[in-house]
Amino acid sequence: LVKEEDIVVDKDLFLINAETGSLYFAGGGTYAQIPAIDGHEDFIYIAGGGEAIGALSMLGGLYVVNQSTKQWELKYKDTVRAYGYARLARFSTGWVFYKGGGGDGKNYVIIVYDDGTVKERSVVGPVSNISTGPYDYCCVGASYQGGARIYTFLATSVPDSLTYYTPGMFTPSAVIQGFHSSPRSVVYSTTSNYTYVSTNPTGTQWTAATTRPQLTALTKGLYANEAGTNTFMLIGNNMKSVSTDGGNNWTTSTLGEYTLTDLIYVDSNWYAIGSNGTKRLLLQNTASTFDQSNK
């Protein structure tokens, strides 16, 4: 789910991707499937907002909407070897995503800047999550030899090599790049609800959360500075877990009747894709409760 300001017709649009990888535009009375792009209909990951809308084809690479022509353009694909692509995130001047599965045992984080510059950095294992946040900090969660390997760096000035830190021996189900007194990140695992918080902007030190989330599944992790609250949120099934103290203590509660499959926070509003068992619905709610009255 990505929110777009369509400056041509002056209305809000949302880019939505189905579980099959098909793309749709919805909003303002419009609901239309986007035809296959260069033959690809495997866009499992989308990111951005406003005038920067991107979609990542699992086999075809990164596509971005040209705001002048309103057409999708290929921004990155490895031309030497066939890789798979996943975990797309947007920062102020570019995109971050994972490249791997090329049969060479290599795993990479790719940074593509809006000016066309590309940076490729090696990581030790498959990437399960990427998150960008305030001040263009980026947190990457990878797995290697049974443990979480977390990379934190400034996306606008990526170092020549990335250094990981290990909060624990678990798979990082979600990483959330946020802010609490200073940039910090949260790593969460569905294994025993393990949750760790970085105690400095560069993610070199991690401490276990005092009160963990109590979720039975994970859909998404999100940071939103809602009314200055520095809110970290995890959602799964029809439950949410929220921290307002930098990720140290989490309060878990049940959402409304909908199971949320995606969630974003834009311009002081929460938007979600929810399912009631028979239909998928686009929901909006400033209080993040998502009940029947707010569909």
Q: What do the predicted segments below correspond to?
A:
Residues 27, 48-49, 116, 141, ...:
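Periodic glycine anchor positions in long extracellular repeat architectures
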